[in-house]
From Swiss-Prot:
This is Uncharacterized protein NMB0075. The keyword RNA-binding applies. GO terms for cellular component: cytosol. SMART domains: S1 (SM00316), YqgFc (SM00732). Residues 711-757 are annotated as: Disordered. Keywords: RNA-binding. Residues 711-741 have a biased composition (Basic and acidic residues). SUPFAM superfamilies: Nucleic acid-binding proteins (SSF50249), Ribonuclease H-like (SSF53098), RuvA domain 2-like (SSF47781), Tex N-terminal region-like (SSF158832). The lineage of its organism: Bacteria, Pseudomonadati, Pseudomonadota, Betaproteobacteria, Neisseriales.
Amino acid sequence: MNITQILSQELSATAAQITAAVELLDDGATVPFIARYRKEATGGLDDTQLRRLAERLQYLRELEERKAVVLKSIEEQGKLSDDLRAQIEAADNKTALEDLYLPYKPKRRTKAQIAREHGLQPLADVLLAEQSQDVEAAAQGYLNENVPDAKAALDGARAILMEQFAEDAELIGTLRDKLWNEAEIHAQVVEGKETEGEKFSDYFDHREPVRTMPSHRALAVLRGRNEGVLNIALKYQPDDTPITRQSEYEQIIACRFKVSDGHKWLRDTVRLTWRAKIFLSLELEALGRLKEAADTDAITVFARNLKDLLLVAPAGRLTTLGLDPGYRNGVKCAVVDDTGKLLDTVIVYLHQENNMLATLSRLIKQHGVKLIAIGNGTASRETDKIAGELVRGMPEMGLHKIVVSEAGASIYSASELAAREFPDLDVSLRGAVSIARRLQDPLAELVKIDPKSIGVGQYQHDVNQNQLAKSLDAVVEDCVNAVGVDVNTASAPLLARISGLNQTLAQNIVAYRDENGAFDSRKKLLKVPRLGEKTFEQAAGFLRINGGKEPLDASAVHPEAYPVVAKMLAQQGISAAELIGNRERVKQIKASDFTDERFGLPTILDILSELEKPGRDPRGEFQTASFAEGIHEISDLQVGMILEGVVSNVANFGAFVDIGVHQDGLVHISALSNKFVQDPREVVKAGDVVKVKVLEVDAARKRIALTMRLDDEPGGAKHKMPSENRSRERTAGRKPQRNDRAPANSAMADAFAKLKR
């Protein structure tokens, strides 16, 4: 197996690109560094391709290591033929490899092994080869002290044949593929659990093809099983099929071993092999495969939403008042300056409105507040109303109020990091600081919180946690490096996400900065303890120094490319300060004049783009939603209302939108646009401000159906999208339920158990 060739085919890249990328990864280079500064070597592979390459490279190398172990084991047994070696070396996945190894894998003594020890292998061979109808007569010649009668002999021979059938790698592969492609998953409610498991009611009698089951339904059904509400099984033939009828799977086994139709004993052996041995194993494997596929899908959705949220445009460096709403414990307030430094805190109470207005007015005037960030949790609407009065009552301050997600703020408040940052500040007030800062710069603040706590995941607690953490860490790393950080203001958690750095180095940078003052050049980073040349190479391009000795230090131009810029300056006869940001002068530079063996055209073009707009931020322009006045609770909603909201989550079946009523509404994929939508992310992403119409409100179940097709009429035929409901009703084998809900509700059943858990 040629790993380079496999990766080349999977990534649609040349062997040279793959080889270069693998060498860089093996040498310790990070994905952001390779994607940004080694484009010539990799032929421009982006971070997504490089992440996939690194993941597959690890898998294929593990596969090669496992092959070596398997080959050695079989060789030591003296059973390694040239044909078997070729099959093992050609195996392109771990499942196929283990199928080949199964007959030779050391195992505890089985019934088949005991039967062989008792001399029954020849009997099994004779019965299969000759297929004599008088099996008892055939068994008489194999009786001994360990095999007292014909029944014992035949039982032993059957055990040998069942093991032989079940360990045929090619056969198992065929049956596995057929079962996956044709079987249905059947979910049924556990008797007596109907009331307790009401949230899983859509799956009380549910059938659908396992191969095409969407991830959100798969995870919902699996959660129902784990909570003891649902029983699930794989069905490979109709329930009313007579037990004596041979299934297609049994026919395949019989055909493989040339078992005649008229040989009852061998047919029974085949049936037992399938039903008691092979199917049970493949069923577990298929459900595991379903879970793995659903995990991957859900993690991909989570990662995409997280990326969108992290790359939401910052409000900017403005003094901000953060409000963490609450009733009984009051509204926690914190003022931070334009750099995020804490200036003041106070707790006010909604039931003391006049005092609250006076206190906040004083804070705003005293510190020159420009932005008010309001957490979107309990009492958010009441707090927002007070903030609105402040904005209207203090026009001279030029105030703006914005409701922001407070997901994870309480977790940050109680974290060790928050305790180190604010050792003398009450835990409840730390959340207000986080809310203020995440408005100023969402990325810089959200990196302090475990990504799983940010609240943009689909069944995040049900998926593989190691895989989830790895994927989300990669997203955070890519986002931080795409934006870059100011080394003189960045926190240690933010610096730790920079290419080449870790927690220790990040803390060392902050400690050096605190002791020696701001860095005035990138070169000074080399004075930080344990930050050597290799780390500097990986990190420097993503670290910005504004107002330093070298103007290029404020850009994404890597220090290794400064000599190229020097040549450009010499050609133009101007200084760096005169060129940087001067679009007209940059346009006069011909990229091809500066390419050489080390720096190709992609790098030169990147340098010119950076010179044209140094330190450019890939995040878009800051925008906010204006929630409708008087709409505070789900009970305030009316069908037909057109509202503005913020996309909080994007799933494969649609988008969840925060419209300010403490319960996100769902825009089903069919209601996102007047044209066909394959992927909701083609239309929206987390953080987008959108206009929606209310189609249906189910206050009891806390479900809100929305549409972005503002000309849709509630209950109108043109927006009834029955494909999903009909397929579910058809496969469930039951009478379709009355469908008097808007189409968006067709996907809300299990998914509306709010993704943010």
